[in-house]
Amino acid sequence: MGEKIVNPEVTVVMPCLNEAETLATCIEKTLETFRSYNIKGEIVVADNGSTDGSQKIAMDLGARVVPVARRGYGAALQGGIAAASAPYIIMGDADDSYDFREIPRFIEALRNSHDFVMGCRFPAGGGEIKPGAMPFLHRYLGTPVLTALGQIFFHHRFKDVNCGMRGFTKRAFEEMALQSDGMEFASEMVARAAMINLKSCEVPVTLHPDGRSRAPHLRTWRDGWRHLKFMLLLCPRWLYRMPGLFLSLLGGIMTLILAITPLSVQGITLDIHTLMVFQMILFLGLQILLFGHLASYYAEQNHLIPPSHQKPWVNPVESGALWGGLFMILGASGLIYTFDLWRDVGFGPLETSQTLRLFSISIFGIILGLELIFVGFLFGLFDLMGKRNKDHTP
C-alpha cells in the first residue's frame, strides 16, 4: 500500500477513480515539490474502486493507497483524510487540472496559523484559468452563482467555492464533521468552515485543462443542483425564514386592510375573494416560518448547524396552548357573532358583504390556533429529545 512516512508535516490527499492517465504526473509533481522545498510529506491516494491499474501506479511511485468502498467524491476524500498522518492536509484532484507544485502556498498559510485555506482559480482572487480548462457554464454561471450565494448564506469572503485544491488542519477537519458523500462535499466544507468560524484565507491557483482523454466525473446540472441543495439545507434562514417572512407580511397586511373594507386601485376592486387569496398567502407564510423554526431546531440538536443566538421557545407546549387558545377564542367569537346575525334573519340568506369577511377571518383564526397548539407539542417533543441528548453527552 506504499511506504508510510514517519511524522510527516503534510499529507496530500488525491481522490482517485480510474485516473491512470494522469495520476503519475500528479504524484511526481508533489514529490518534486517535497524535495524542492524540503517538505516532509506523504501522499495518500484515496481509491474509490479503480479498475485501470491506478493503485499500482500510485504504490510504485511511493504513495500510500487507501481503498474506499463507499462511492462518491466526498466519500473518497473522507476516507483518505481519515487515513492521513500529518497535522496539515492538502486535497487536490488527480486529473492534472491542478498543479501540485503550488502546494507551498497552502503550507505557508497553514504554518501561519490558518485552519482552512481555499484555492482560488479566478482572476479576482489572483488565480488563472487556462484556455479550455473550465466549461463556459461553470465559469460564468455555476461557480459565480454558488459563490455569491455562499457569501450571502454563510458570510464568507471566498471568491471561488468550487476550487478542488484546498488545505486545512486535521483538527479543523474533525471540527467540521462533514457528512456528504458526493460532489456537494466541497460546498459543505466551505459552509461548515464559515459556520464554525475557522481562521481562513484564500490563495491563488492555476487551473489547467483536464489531462484525461475521457469525460470528467462532474455532471454540470446534477452536481450543480446537489451543491445548491446542500447549501440551502444548511441555511434555514434563507430557505424558510426569508420567504416565510415575505409571504406573512404581504398576506397579513392585505388581510388586515381587506378585512375592514374593499380596496380600489385604478379601477380594480379588491374585495372578499381577494381577501381569501391573501389569507391563503398569510397561512402559507406562517406555515413556512414554522417549518423553518422546526428545521433550525432539529439541525441544531443534531449538530448540523451551530446553535443560534436566539432564545429558544420557552415552555413550547404551554406557549403554543396559550397563543393557540387565544386565536381559537377570537375565531370562535367571530363565528358566534355570525351565527347571531344568521339567527336574526330567521336562518335565511345572509348579506355576503356584511358577514363573509368576518366568517373567513374567524375560520382562519381557529385553524391557526389549532396549528399552534399541536406545533407547541411537537416543539415540546424536540425539547425533550434535546435534553436527553445533552444528558447522554460524555
Model-derived segments and spans:
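N-proximal low-complexity "stem/linker" segments adjacent to membrane-targeting elements
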Residues: 1-32, 39
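Acceptor/aglycone-binding surface of glycosyltransferases and processive sugar-polymer synthases
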Residues: 68-83, 88, 100-183, 210-230
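Conserved donor nucleotide-binding strand/loop of the catalytic core
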Residues: 37-44, 55-83
